[in-house]
Design a protein with these regions (language model features):
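Alpha-helical segment of the N-proximal tetratricopeptide repeat
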Residues: 1-4
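Leucine-rich, hydrophobic repeat-scaffold detector
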Residues: 11-12
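Histidine-centered active-site/metal-ligand motif
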Residues: 28, 70, 112, 547, ...
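Alpha-helical solenoid repeat scaffolds used for protein-protein interaction
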Residues: 37, 44, 48-49, 56-60, ...
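Catalytic cores of enzymes
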Residues: 254, 267-699
Length: 699
């Protein structure tokens, strides 16, 4: 069910139903659970007419056996109400939603997550039935809980603003807060694992982190105990004990709030990573320069939203694309950016589609163009599939042809890059944290690099790759999803080692960049030396540039499985120090003072499926460690192109520090694009693979 294999699940549920009915009788609670699931599968398969009977039978069994106020009754009520809502039987749905909410409030207390879910369900129902004024107070209640669902609150807040039920300022700030809290979840895995590592220490931060973990564990245990208690028959319940547990949960919430304030004062870096306070419009505007515009995106089920902010103005508009439609368009947009496939394609079908690039510009930036188009720099905070979209390759004017007759024709497209430098932020709060610490002195050494790691000893090349011939190879590899290599509680490293292609040309890339920036051979780590052991033992804070030319691994589309990671040499005997995977939580423990962290060699930004949010967790961890900006590849990069773009960017910034990182990258890409010595130079896959993540301005 969780993987949406609904058709496969149906016969299994039917079999389970037959077994339970035979073994336990037709009115056993387990039978009701299976019936409820069967009805849900029917709904998911768009068979509404078939769904009603099993859900109603489930409800009847639960009411009879468990009692009318049992939490499981609320579950059946909620599913039946959702079915009626989908059928637009609003008069039938509303009392069921309200009864489900009342049951959960009585049984679980007003602050329980299930109560927030029921409140969200009722709020969204009222909104879709045209009653925004009734939906708004319920949506605001979920916002206060900190557990608001973006798909619910954003449409309601947007509609309330349009209907003047909320002031512009209040609606925008509440929407911004909801978006920022939603963004935190995408990096939660790395943050949680970092907290575990920090808690193992003996200093003041470790003490506070351990206390937070203990309180969270106690609250979770009490919550489970309450659910178990209220699931019993009325005669078996200890109501006084339940009330004491609820009181203790409330006290824990207060203690944790105080602890967060202490962390914010004593360890602001950690607090900004683990539990950042949302920024409002008035907090953001002073952080922007006069030449900057910030666009913040949130994409939910059926629509998306963009909030544009400059020093002097703000706008909030709807995007006419929902999550699925946008994911499909971003995937189609990226197809022409695989160099190997573009060259091998017969005809023009494999080449980059300028018309689609313009269509996405109109949808994503067109609604706020009046506020943003005259700014020199655009700061983008993407979400969902937009994390996989290279915004600088959007086209601002309708092209003469979707695919030019010749590659040179791409040079004349109205690329957004010609108008603005683009930088990406993994979260809204990162603007504040990066600019607060952007004035540190840079490292004293130019660069250290890690590349051509050994994944499979059987495929290992020459021991000394520093003397490589300099031959350039086009890389055509995909970011690997953890979910392809998951075994039990960990990654199957043997299988991963066999699957990861070796990257011999990255040795040439690293050596070329090192020569250009003046780094010594001793600072370039190749082959087996490109390992976690070498990295963790190095004095990384002395380097201005830290360069990784290797594969990125993303958590994939199954949440909770691992962290985004960088693949280094896989050791013969994995250890806690070195297992070959540099995870986001390990990155956060590094001590950096780098102007740049470069992630080259693969499409580190996104996985095989647009929306696999590797960006947020990995980038936030590098920023926490002390990096000011990341230069990250969107797709498999030609080694020569990677070298040319990175060295040009570094040289431009060195010669003109006042232009800032984003403008330096922009000029490097435009110089490549406008180089008429080869038709290939005009093709966006060659000049446009890198995105700047983090601080792009002069600080």
């Amino acid at each position: 069910m969780k993987q949406e294999h609904f058709a496969d699940a149906e016969p299994l549920f039917q079999r389970a139903l037959a077994i339970y009915q035979k073994a336990a009788g037709p009115e056993h609670p387990a039978v009701a659970t299976v019936l409820n699931n069967i009805g849900q599968v029917d709904r998911d398969l768009n068979r509404d007419a078939d769904a009603e009977a099993p859900i109603k039978r489930s409800l009847a069994i639960r009411e009879k056996v468990l009692g009318p106020d049992h939490p499981d009754v609320a579950r059946s009520l909620n599913n039946l109400a959702g079915l009626y809502e989908h059928q637009q039987r609003y008069a039938d749905a509303e009392p069921l939603y309200r009864r489900a909410l009342a049951i959960r409030e009585r049984a679980l207390g007003p602050d329980h997550p299930d109560v927030v879910t029921s409140t969200s369900n009722l709020a969204y129902f009222l909104y879709v039935s045209g009653r925004t004024a009734d939906a708004l107070p319920l949506a605001e209640r979920t916002l206060r809980s900190g557990r608001a669902q973006l798909r619910v609150v954003l449409p309601i807040l947007f509609s309330a603003r349009q209907q003047h039920l909320l002031s512009d300022d209040k609606a925008l700030d509440e929407a911004l807060a909801a978006i920022q809290r939603g963004t935190q979840s995408s990096a939660a895995s790395a943050v949680n694992k970092l907290a575990v590592r920090l808690a193992a220490g003996s200093d003041r931060l470790a003490e506070l982190v351990r206390k937070e973990q203990d309180l969270a564990a106690e609250a979770e245990a009490l919550d489970k105990a309450i659910i178990t208690a209220v699931s019993k028959q009325a005669a078996q319940r200890d109501v006084a004990a339940e009330q004491r547990s609820r009181a203790r949960i409330a006290a824990i919430a207060s203690e944790r709030a105080g602890l967060q304030k202490t962390l914010a004062v004593e360890f602001p870096d950690y607090a900004s990573l683990s539990n950042p306070l949302p920024l409002g419009v008035k907090d953001i505007q002073p952080l922007l320069s006069a030449d900057e515009a910030m666009t913040i995106y949130s994409v939910v089920d059926k629509q998306g939203y963009v909030i544009a902010i400059t020093r002097e103005g703000v706008d909030w508009k709807e995007i006419p694309l929902g999550a699925d439609a946008l994911a499909q368009k971003v995937s189609a947009f990226r197809k022409g950016l695989d160099v190997g496939k573009a060259h091998d394609a017969s005809g023009k079908s494999g080449l980059f589609d300028l018309a689609l690039a313009n269509e996405l510009y109109v949808a994503l930036l067109g609604p706020v163009e009046a506020l943003t188009k005259d700014k020199r720099s655009l700061l983008v905070v993407p979400s969902a599939a937009l994390t996989a979209l290279p915004f600088h390759l959007l086209v601002t004017e309708k092209p003469q042809a979707a695919i030019p007759d010749k590659l040179e024709g791409y040079r004349n497209a109205a690329w957004l890059l010609r108008r603005q430098a683009v930088s990406v932020l993994p979260s809204v709060i990162s603007l504040k944290s990066l600019r607060a610490f952007a004035r540190k002195d840079q490292g004293v050494k130019p660069m250290t690099g890690f590349g051509d790691p050994v994944f499979n000893p059987a495929a290992e090349g020459p021991a000394d790759r520093r003397a490589a011939s300099g031959k350039v190879a086009a890389r055509s590899i995909a970011t690997i999803a953890y979910t392809d290599f998951w075994r039990g509680a960990g990654v199957d490293r043997a299988r991963l080692a066999q699957a990861l292609p070796q990257l011999p040309d990255t040795a040439d890339e690293l050596n070329a960049v090192a020569r250009d920036v003046g780094a010594g051979d001793v600072d370039i780590h190749l082959g087996r030396d490109a390992s976690e052991t070498t990295l963790k033992r190095a004095a990384l804070a002395q380097y201005s540039i830290i360069y990784f030319a290797t594969h990125g691994l993303v958590a994939g589309d199954v949440k909770g499985l691992g962290e985004p990671s960088l693949a280094l040499s896989i050791p013969d005997q994995p250890s806690e120090l070195d297992d070959g995977l540099l995870t986001a939580s390990e990155v956060a423990q590094l001590k950096l003072n780098a102007d740049w962290v470069v992630l080259s060699a693969c499409n580190t930004i996104a996985g095989d499926k647009p929306g696999a949010e590797a960006l947020s967790g990995l980038a936030r961890s590098f920023f926490y460690a002390g990096a000011r900006a990341l230069l990250v590849s969107h797709w498999a990069v030609d080694s020569e192109a990677a070298t040319r773009l990175t060295t040009s960017t570094f040289a431009l910034l060195k010669n003109e520090p006042g232009i800032g990182r984003a403008q330096a990258l922009r000029r490097a890409m435009l110089t490549y694009l406008d180089d008429a010595s080869s038709p290939r130079n005009a093709y966006p896959a060659m000049w446009g693979p890198f995105a700047l993540i983090g601080e792009g301005d002069v600080r």
